[in-house]
Swiss-Prot record:
PROSITE patterns: ABC_TRANSPORTER_1, ABC_TRANSPORTER_2, METN. The complex is composed of two ATP-binding proteins (MetN), two transmembrane proteins (MetI) and a solute-binding protein (MetQ). Belongs to the ABC transporter superfamily. Methionine importer (TC 3.A.1.24) family. It is found in: Cell inner membrane. ATP binds at G36, A37, S38, G39, A40, G41, K42, S43. The keyword DNA-binding does not apply. Its main location: membrane. Signal peptide: none annotated. This is Methionine import ATP-binding protein MetN. Its EC number is 7.4.2.11.
Length: 332
């Protein structure tokens, strides 16, 4: 659906490349995350998809079209197929909720009856039918983002671009908006590109993710692989921030390891079985259970002492548990 072929972008002012040699593909119907720190090039990347920016080198192909080669009419048609939602909502303050949602339909010259019916349908989908006559100033942040989503869907796009769509929201509202986005992907088959600086957002809704650092893709793959086995320093930093950077507390001895359980292994009593079999004692330094979309996984950070620690690590691994050494000898 979307392909970047060795894309670079350098702005005239400053001359520093915002993107350098970016190549990636987004499959039709998937939720693709792009994560990076501020200034990594995320917003530039997403603006290249709908032609708000043009590449300095390389090609951006969207639904079969070379975006940079499109004329005015072609870009207008592309933007009807590519909806976008923003961090700060970008609503028209002088128009009601219904008028904001109807705006792109009116610009497209749709008949009044169609505009009215489509607007009502979209407001129902995002749960705002009762707020159709309100103005943006009367809405909460989450409600404003729902209006933005409804407006982005007005022209039945194939692609939805989400530029930091939850970063201005509180945690509970973020969960609700992510649930809505995931539902749109499931129910409408939308291809979604989600820009964020939060690994927790990626884990919650994305199928695959690209990690950007200083304008370059430093890692790309399935969310499960990148989250549980990050290969780049940048990805490891984001995972630590999402999980909590647990290291040995002062005075804690032994070998400190992180155990990662995935799928059904998450709920099995592996820890007790290994401790009994090997005589190893353990102190729990941290732990949590989460989901990568629908797949449960758990992580425990332990200090292992006494007994046969090497045998304990081998037994964990034989049970399908990943073991990462955080201090002491390296686990295999």
């Amino acid at each position: 659906m979307i392909t970047f072929q060795d894309v670079s972008k350098t702005y005239a002012q400053g001359g520093h490349p915002a993107l350098s040699g970016v190549s990636l593909s987004v499959k039709a119907g998937e939720v693709f995350g792009v994560i990076g720190a501020s200034g990594a090039g995320k917003s530039t990347l997403i603006r290249l998809i709908n032609g708000l920016e043009t590449p300095s080198a390389g090609q951006v192909i969207v639904d079969g079209d070379d975006v940079a080669a499109l004329g005015v009419a072609g870009l207008r048609a592309l933007r009807r197929r590519v909806g976008m939602i923003f961090q700060h909502f970008n609503l028209l303050s002088g128009k009601t909720v219904a008028q904001n949602v109807a705006f792109p339909l009116k610009l497209a010259g749709r008949p009044a009856a169609e505009v009215k019916a489509r607007t009502a349908e979209l407001l129902e989908r995002v749960g705002l039918s009762a707020h159709a006559g309100k103005y943006p100033a009367q809405l909460s942040g989450g409600q404003k983002q729902r209006v933005g989503i409804a407006r982005a869907l007005a022209t039945n796009p194939k692609v939805l671009l989400c530029d930091e769509a939850t970063s201005a929201l509180d945690p509970e509202t973020t969960e609700q908006i992510l649930d809505l986005i995931a539902g749109l992907n499931r129910e409408l088959g939308l291809t979604i590109v989600l820009i964020t600086h939060e690994m927790d957002v990626v884990r919650r809704v994305c199928d695959r993710v690209a990690v950007l650092d200083a304008g370059r893709v430093v890692e790309e793959g399935a969310v499960e692989e990148v989250f549980l086995h990050p290969a780049s320093d940048t990805a490891r930093r984001f995972v630590r921030e999402a999980e909590g950077d647990v290291t040995a507390a002062p005075g804690v001895g032994g070998r400190v390891v992180r155990l990662t359980f995935k799928g059904e292994a998450t709920y099995k009593p592996v820890l007790g079985e290994v401790a009994r079999a090997t005589g190893v004692d353990y102190s729990i330094l941290g732990g949590r259970i989460h989901r990568l979309r629908e797949t449960p996984y758990g992580q425990l950070t332990l200090a292992l002492t006494g007994g046969d620690v090497a045998a304990a690590i081998a037994q964990f691994q034989a049970a399908g548990v990943r073991v990462d050494a955080l201090s002491g000898e390296t686990a295999q």
